[in-house]
Amino acid sequence: MLRWLTAGESHGPALMGIIEGVPAGVEITSGHIADSLARRRLGYGRGARMKFEQDVVTILGGVRHGVTQGGPVAVQVGNTEWPKWEQIMAPDPVDPELLADQARNAPLTRPRPGHADFTGMQKYGFDEARPVLERASARETATRVAMGTVAAQFLKHLGIELVSHTVSIASVSVPDGRPLPEPADVIALDADPLRCFDRETSDAMVAEVDAAHKEGETLGGVVEVLAYGLPPGLGSYVHWDRRLDSRLAAALMGIQAIKGVEVGDGFRTAARRGSAAHDEIVRDEDGRIVRASNRAGGIEGGMSIGDVLRVRAAMKPIATVPRALKTIDVSTGEPAKAHHQRSDVCAVPAAGVVAEAMVALVLAEAVTEKFGGDSVAETARNIKGYLDNIPASLDSIGQ
């Protein structure tokens, strides 16, 4: 069974993650993880923090000479800004006199709308928002990307590859019918300012971000994750919590600022007649069984069908708005403007990288559940044996 956990705070010394259940033989280095974290920092409209705060990756366990050993893999993502926060965020008690004159230690008593601040203070009994925002911060996704990189490397050994891209920023969207990016397109995608596969749309997105920046606004959008090379049968129809689409939706909804998820054509199918909503099963010109389309996004009945997996996640505009929204200062009870720390105008491209990591983690878990294997070679043999034993009358290929 594959499982993982993260720990750490936004301005703490480091973020940490442990992923257990990764078979032996997966090639993974700190360089792989650092490259993924660099992708997370990409995107037009990011804030100043992306420029001066670096991710320092250290693999602490489970890997020897660039190869997993079968034990838990532990990864630390160090924070180069830690010296500035060492006293404010120290785990051990600090002399109050040392903290008194530090501006960074000022109580955050004006909770920000759209964040976890206010309800977190209620739930955990805090009189200020610092303890809440330190853990609730999207900075935590750096560890998820690290864990997802390990999972993606495992999947890559099995011929499964993932791609994420931006399909909309605010009201600017990639037109329907445009080709989907493939694994060979990742370098070009990452070179685009907004990780958009359509150049004309990307230019319009850049203009939208510029306009929002001038107006002191923030923007959201939609990202899509594609998975190529999946075998049929991951997930199950037997119970709700074993359905692959259920697990993907939960994983994507767990990303900060994500407010909606769809699989395949998702919400658009609700406006169609039944005959135009599903994927007919036919024979192609070579006589092989295929689906005539992929409106389902590669999942039917809670199981992968062998076609390209396609899921989307909708990100709301960043809640830390430069213009500062109305709130209440909980120390005085008076109306106030919310705290405004530096923020991005748009972080949708980064959300795509995080979503890609979360999808990798879900798929890696589904693969280990279905096929097992103490080594990646054993997992690959098990997949081959499974596919070889599908009866000829049921054999199919992906689109």
Curated annotation (Swiss-Prot):
Pathway: Metabolic intermediate biosynthesis; chorismate biosynthesis; chorismate from D-erythrose 4-phosphate and phosphoenolpyruvate: step 7/7. InterPro entries: Chorismate_synth, Chorismate_synth_AroC_sf, Chorismate_synthase_CS. Its cofactor is FMNH2. CDD domains: Chorismate_synthase (cd07304). GO terms for biological process: amino acid biosynthetic process; aromatic amino acid family biosynthetic process; chorismate biosynthetic process. Reduced FMN (FMNH(2)). Its EC number is 4.2.3.5. Gene3D superfamilies: Chorismate synthase AroC. Keywords: Amino-acid biosynthesis, Aromatic amino acid biosynthesis, FAD, Flavoprotein, FMN, Lyase, NADP. FMN binds at residues 135-137, 256-257, 301, 316-320, 342. One of its GO terms (molecular function) is chorismate synthase activity. The keyword Phosphoprotein does not apply. One of its GO terms (cellular component) is cytosol. NADP(+) binds at residues 40, 46. The keyword Transmembrane helix does not apply. This reaction introduces a second double bond into the aromatic ring system. NCBIfam families: aroC (TIGR00033), PRK05382.1 (NF003793). Belongs to the chorismate synthase family. HAMAP family: Chorismate_synth. Homotetramer. This is Chorismate synthase. The lineage of its organism: Bacteria, Bacillati, Actinomycetota, Actinomycetes, Micrococcales.
